[in-house]
Amino acid sequence: RQMCIRDSYILECHEKAELKPDKRDPSFPAYLQWFHYCEGMVMPPVNTIVVQTVLLPPDRRDETALSQAKKLLTRALEPVNMELSGRDYLIGNFSAADIMLGHACFMSNRLGCVPEEMSNLKRYVANISSRPAFDLAINMQ
């Protein structure tokens, strides 16, 4: 939720960046769906995976919880993979929905939860990763 709040604040303060379609634009409902899909569907299992593989000491990790989270994450990414068929970004043009979900997809791929069969999602992660601002942000020390 914090990511969503942060990104909503940035969007309101920097309207000229055109990272969100006008509410009258036909792509606005899809934009809202994908903007919030990240926090509602993708990040909960990502958080569980990080807790079970990084944050908890090995003796407190739960392989069942980890396995369930990985399966859930892969399932949550299936609609994203389908939506990206024939397009580079979620609503056509790059938007704040891609900022939200793009990072989550990048991390999901890094965690090994994006199978090769999800070729649209693999391509999307490559597109997001090639953006200079993403490269700068992900490699900050």
Where are these regions (language model features)?
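GST-like domain detector, emphasizing the conserved glutathione-binding G-site
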Residues: Q2, R6-S67, K71-T74, N81, ...
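Short, thiol/selenol-centered motifs that function as redox-active sites or metal-ligating centers
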Residues: M3-C4, D98-I99, R131
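Alpha-helix C-capping/helix-to-loop hinge sites
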Residues: C13, A17, P57, G86-R87, ...
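Amphipathic alpha-helical interaction segments
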Residues: A30-Q33, D98-I99, H103, R123
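GST superfamily/GST-like fold recognition
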Residues: M41, P45-V50, Y89-V114, I128
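Acidic interhelical loop/turn segments
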Residues: L55-R60, G86-A96
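Surface-exposed helix-capping loop/turn segments at secondary-structure junctions
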Residues: M82-N93, A133-A137
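C-terminal end-helix/capping segment
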Residues: E117-D135
